[in-house]
């Protein structure tokens, strides 16, 4: 029985080793990207064509690259701008609370249109472009959420909003629901600002929407919001500096290198984590077997000594 158990444990360890090797190799794809370009990056965005957008807080620059690191466009700002999740690479949206301005730029990061909110509104804390016609504005002074058509410069709707503006870092409005993100809290409201959901989230940065799915991009974690189950962690790497995803892949900057993970890679990583869990359980089983073997040996030794004494 003992030999059978040892053989079984050995075969299990071999199979786990093969899982480790396969998953480790398949789940790591380093993109050929200049590490100097990644070193001082504060945030990273990706589109569904595999292009990368790097925002540097040091000089307020926003640069677009293809997946091989070739520069496709660059913007230099004099004040901080917040980049809205990139749904359409032909029209990228940026908002500056300092400048009270929203900008739309094309695939080469050339200006398409600028919206100046200073003339028409008191103070806009945050803005979210729903499409190429209307935006949602959080007016801090009026404590209202405004639906504004910038094509004909008219306010379509105005909703009271008396929640705190101080720690707000991102806003998203979709299908009559308002998604509010602070650095450590996620909230969902209806347009009457009745709270529908609330959950803590660490080091949150921004929202991303993929069709009907609302995602939260945090420092090194990505969550998916499920109205029935709450927040579900779909990507996590404690060692990552920055993470992001498009519809097909996950991206991360780690050790000033750029990594790409396909959906298949994520499945392999889950297998790897499960294998690690099984490895720990096996190690405990081996330790238990060795302990039992040692105890059995001690008992046999005592019995031999008793026999030697003539009992």
Features from the language model and the residues they span:
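A short beta-strand motif characteristic of beta-propeller blades
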Residues: 29-37, 69-75, 111-117, 153-162, ...
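Start-of-domain marker
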Residues: 29-90
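Blade-level signature of beta-propeller repeat domains, shared across WD40, Kelch, NHL, RCC1
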Residues: 244-276
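Repeated scaffold domains used in trafficking and secretory/extracellular systems
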Residues: 38-45, 79-86, 121-129, 165-173, ...
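Bacterial Sec-dependent N-terminal signal peptides
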Residues: 1-32, 310-311
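Structural motif
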Residues: 59-63, 100-104, 143-147, 186-190, ...
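Short loop/turn segments that connect beta-strands within beta-propeller blades
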Residues: 66-68, 106-110, 149-152, 190-194, ...
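Short beta-strand elements that form the blades of beta-propeller/WD-repeat-like
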Residues: 43-46, 50-56, 90-96, 133-139, ...
């Amino acid at each position: 029985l003992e030999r059978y158990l040892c053989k079984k444990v050995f075969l299990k360890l071999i199979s786990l080793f093969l899982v480790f090797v396969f998953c480790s190799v398949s789940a790591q794809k380093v993109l050929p990207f200049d590490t100097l370009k990644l070193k001082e990056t504060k945030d990273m965005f990706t589109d569904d064509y595999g292009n990368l957008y790097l925002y540097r807080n040091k000089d307020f620059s926003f640069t677009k690259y293809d997946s091989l690191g070739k520069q496709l466009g660059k913007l230099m700002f004099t004040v901080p701008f917040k980049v809205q999740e990139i749904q359409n690479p032909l029209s990228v949206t940026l908002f500056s609370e300092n400048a009270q301005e929203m900008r739309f730029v094309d695939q080469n990061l050339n200006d398409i249109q600028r919206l100046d909110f200073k003339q028409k509104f008191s103070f806009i804390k945050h803005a979210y472009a729903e499409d190429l016609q209307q935006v949602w504005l959080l007016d801090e002074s009026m404590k209202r959420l405004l639906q504004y058509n910038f094509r004909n410069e008219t306010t379509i709707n105005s909703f009271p909003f008396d929640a705190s503006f101080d720690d707000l870092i991102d806003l998203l409005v979709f299908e009559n629901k308002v998604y509010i993100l602070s650095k450590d809290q996620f909230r969902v409201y209806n347009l009457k600002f009745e709270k529908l959901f609330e959950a803590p989230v660490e080091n949150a940065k921004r929202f991303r929407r993929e069709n009907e799915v609302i995602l939260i991009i945090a420092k090194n974690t990505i969550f998916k919001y499920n109205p029935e189950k709450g927040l579900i962690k779909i990507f996590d790497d404690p060692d990552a500096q920055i993470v992001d995803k498009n519809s097909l892949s996950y991206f991360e900057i780690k050790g000033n290198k750029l990594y790409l993970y396909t959906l298949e890679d994520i499945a392999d990583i889950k297998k790897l984590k499960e294998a690690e869990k099984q490895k720990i359980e096996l190690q405990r089983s081996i330790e238990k077997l060795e302990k039992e073997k040692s105890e059995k040996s001690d008992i046999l030794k005592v019995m031999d000594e008793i026999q030697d004494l003539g009992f």
